[in-house]
């Protein structure tokens, strides 16, 4: 080091206010080690003078490998652009997973790109309008980088129209900042526009199984981009838990409301026939109820259309946006309710009910063992469900050897970095191997893995649930004279021991939806069915 410390103007590096410098090998450095480029700070020869002067030097090309530039956090407009670039990288990864792993149509990538372009144009418009409003009010301080702008639209409670007018600026700000949750909304809306049978529940399952990158998607962002993001933006890209059905639905409805109100985008309803067929298979119902469920669904839609056309303002934009909101929010729940009501019509949840009207002229009727259906469906879904996400220190003590091996495999896949094997020391891996290679121990371990043979065995048991049995001639005559009256599944004071109530609870639990919403949908479908029967009479 040449000479002593001397004082000068503040350092030219951003966020460094050091005024003390030293020289080393002819180069001037500040107290924090930042090299001063382009300006030479000279000290007076007379000691104690306390004066300094600046001399211009030939402009030197700045070294791009300087750590100060690479690690510098970007704020303002550049920070927004960098965050949107990081979000776009995650969208590209999810599109690749849809086309390569799941075999989706290649058009979905272009559809998501178009929706993202519309969203970007809308965010730019909202930012410019808010920027102009800030410039008009000179007394208002700039708050573009505050937490106020990072408000999630779905976390806001329902407000009155008057309060919405006062918070118009904050809503326009929130449009410019899509959280990671809205990536699933882009996928779902793109599938709606392409008429692909993707449900919110299936999207949630694909995210939980890491088939669609979500929980660790931020690790795929280049480091030179990620470390320059503001901390508030980083929080929006790192999720703390997997998204639930309700949160994905809220993000979808928010995105649809924005696109419909701004661009008058026509969002079609879900592809109900294909989704209905998939739901019947997933809950192991007989395929014979597909046609009754489809007819019942058409009856429900006709009742909704009759109720909608009675209003004079039905063709207005507000009414159309509300109708799209209602269709998307209740579509899957309405399909589940239609399947359950169709099963009640065809087979009945109570032994006193009419079994199946198509067996009136036959010597057979269908005897349904709903207790077996409940036990087998619950068993199959428990085997297919990954239970490690909610595991804690108490439940880990109940795992056997095979479950413990699967837990370590899951942990290694989810949390151990492939490019950094030093996360787990090599010595510990030798003492406690993740994959046990002891064949004699594995032979004695119970196999809880769901194989194809076990699935076939469970399906064979499910075939015994809906079994045609013979009836006597006298019972046949009484059965044919019986009046076709529909018995409601769930009365207003439901009994928890009732078979219909137990089946409804099971379906709501497996589909991860609220029980109250499913019960309300079932009662609405039943009212439409009774209205249709009354109109035919």
UniProtKB/Swiss-Prot annotation:
The keyword Glycosyltransferase does not apply. A zinc finger (RRN7-type) spans 4-37. Residues 38-64 are annotated as: B-reader. Its main location: nucleus. The keyword Transmembrane helix does not apply. InterPro entries: Rrn7_cyclin_C, Rrn7_cyclin_N, TAF1B/Rrn7, TF_Rrn7_Zf. Residues 65-80 are annotated as: B-linker. It comes from the Eukaryota. Component of RNA polymerase I core factor complex (CF) that acts as a sua7/TFIIB-like factor and plays a key role in multiple steps during transcription initiation such as pre-initiation complex (PIC) assembly and postpolymerase recruitment events in polymerase I (Pol I) transcription. Binds HomolD box in rDNA promoters and plays a role in Pol I recruitment. This is RNA polymerase I-specific transcription initiation factor rrn7. It comes from Schizosaccharomyces pombe (strain 972 / ATCC 24843) (Fission yeast).
């Amino acid at each position: 080091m040449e000479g002593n410390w001397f004082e000068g103007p503040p350092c030219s590096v951003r966020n460094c206010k050091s005024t003390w410098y030293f020289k080393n090998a002819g180069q001037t450095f500040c107290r924090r080690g930042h090299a001063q480029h382009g300006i030479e700070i000279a000290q007076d020869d007379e000691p104690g003078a306390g004066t300094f002067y600046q001399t211009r030097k030939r402009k030197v090309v700045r070294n791009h490998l300087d750590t100060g530039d690479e690690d510098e956090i970007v704020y303002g407009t550049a920070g927004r652009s960098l965050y949107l670039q990081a979000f776009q990288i995650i969208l590209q990864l999810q599109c690749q997973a849809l086309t390569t792993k799941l075999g989706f149509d290649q058009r979905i990538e272009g559809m998501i790109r178009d929706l993202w372009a519309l969203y970007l144009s809308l965010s730019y418009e909202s930012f410019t309008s808010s920027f102009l409003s800030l410039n008009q009010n000179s007394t208002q301080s700039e708050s573009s980088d505050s937490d106020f702008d990072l408000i999630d639209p779905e976390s806001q409670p329902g407000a009155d129209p008057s309060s919405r007018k006062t918070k118009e600026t904050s809503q326009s700000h929130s449009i410019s900042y899509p959280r990671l949750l809205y990536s699933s909304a882009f996928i779902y809306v793109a599938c709606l526009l392409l008429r692909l049978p993707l449900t919110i529940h299936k999207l949630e399952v694909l995210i939980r199984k890491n088939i669609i990158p979500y929980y660790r998607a931020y690790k795929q962002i280049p480091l030179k981009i990620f470390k320059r993001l503001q901390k508030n933006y980083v929080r929006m890209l790192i999720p703390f838990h997997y998204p639930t059905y309700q949160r994905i639905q809220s993000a979808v409805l928010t995105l649809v409301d924005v696109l419909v109100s701004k661009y008058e985008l026509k969002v079609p309803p879900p592809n109900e026939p294909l989704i209905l067929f998939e739901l019947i298979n997933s809950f192991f119902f007989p395929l014979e109820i597909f046609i009754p469920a489809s007819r019942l669904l058409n009856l429900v839609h006709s009742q909704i259309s009759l109720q909608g056309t009675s209003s004079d303002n039905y063709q207005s934009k507000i009414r159309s946006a509300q109708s799209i909101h209602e269709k998307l929010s209740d579509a899957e729940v309405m399909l589940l309710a239609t399947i359950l009501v169709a099963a009640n019509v065809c087979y009945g949840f109570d032994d006193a009910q009419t079994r199946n009207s198509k067996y009136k002229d036959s010597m057979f009727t269908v005897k349904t063992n709903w207790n077996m259906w409940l036990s087998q469906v619950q068993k199959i879904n428990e085997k297919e469900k990954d239970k490690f996400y909610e595991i804690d220190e108490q439940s880990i003590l109940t795992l056997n050897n095979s479950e413990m091996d699967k837990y370590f495999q899951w942990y290694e896949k989810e949390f151990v970095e492939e490019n950094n094997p030093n996360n787990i020391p090599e010595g510990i891996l030798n003492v406690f191997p993740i994959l046990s290679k002891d064949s004699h121990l594995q032979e004695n371990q119970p196999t809880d893995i769901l194989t194809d043979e076990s699935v076939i065995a469970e399906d064979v048991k499910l075939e015994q649930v809906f079994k045609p049995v013979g009836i006597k001639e006298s019972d046949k005559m009484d059965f044919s004279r019986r009046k076709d009256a529909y018995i409601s599944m769930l009365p207003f004071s439901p009994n928890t021991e009732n078979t219909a109530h137990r089946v409804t609870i099971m379906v709501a639990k497996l589909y991860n939806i609220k029980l109250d919403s499913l019960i309300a949908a079932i009662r609405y479908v039943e009212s439409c069915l009774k209205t249709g029967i009354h109109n035919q009479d």
